[in-house]
Amino acid sequence: MAFIADQVAQGRAVESICRVLREQGCQVAARTYREWRRPSRPVADRIVTDAQVQDAVRDAAWATSPDGVRRLAPEGLYGRRKMTAHLRRTALPQASAGAVDRAMRTLGLAGVRRGKTLRTTVPGKDGTRAGDLLDRNFTAPAPNRVWVSDFTYVRTWAGFAYVAFIADVFAQKIVAWHAATTKTTDLVMTPLRMAIWQRSREDRAVEPGQLISHSDAGSQYTALRFTEHLALEGIAPSIGSVGDAYDNALMESVIGLFKTECVRTTVFHAGPYKAVSDVEYATAGWVDWWNNRRLHGTLGMITPNEAEEAHYAALIPQEQPV
């Protein structure tokens, strides 16, 4: 190209120069020379922005394990809305939903989708049932006012494992969980004790007479041992109607997300579940993510722990200027 430029500077025509070069076996078109001489065009702002967003989405959606393997991270489960909120919180405050959508489509990310759920709770026939104190109102003015409980199953090579959860309605925080190979009363008693202990450990102990424990009509929750322990702790029992998932809709939603985000992916456990210990390992990772890093749309795209901390921070009297 420099040779052609020198010849042009001496007054020769580009077409003539290129024709002579082609006759000598050098295939150069006049259009190629003119394109080479043309000043480079500035890259469009959208192309630059899309590249930045795509890099940020890739970094958020995949993580490198200690052994150097690239794996999908929990944030890779997000759809467009939550991925946009995540990037605005962490890497790109001005990230647009459109740019995130384009980046996710380019990278083959679409978020996870909920599947069907299977009924695992058998109504208690002999247990005395408490009334429904919530009437499908899954809101609370503060933490430790309403807890919801339920359990689900996970298939393993050794048989079924059952995982019971307790979530605080105020910020949807999972305050306790327990996995076992049988669905006896201990399956739900253990997380209840753990939840009470954990709240005390956080210096946010349950106050007698202030908390409602809501569940479905399963025999584990209507068992005498369970209801007596609630009474001992000053916790009011609440039981939804038989066979109606909407009466415990919040907990059904939590369990549905547990199945979708944890059980049916390899994000929190690589490979099949061989025993209950594998289920415990995966559940521990998912609950930690749920409480501390997962963004919740119903909370304004913050985490349950952030929502609780904001609540307690608002209760601290602000210093008045002198």
What are these regions (language model features)?
Residues 1-322:
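Charged DNA-binding/catalytic regions of mobile-element recombinases
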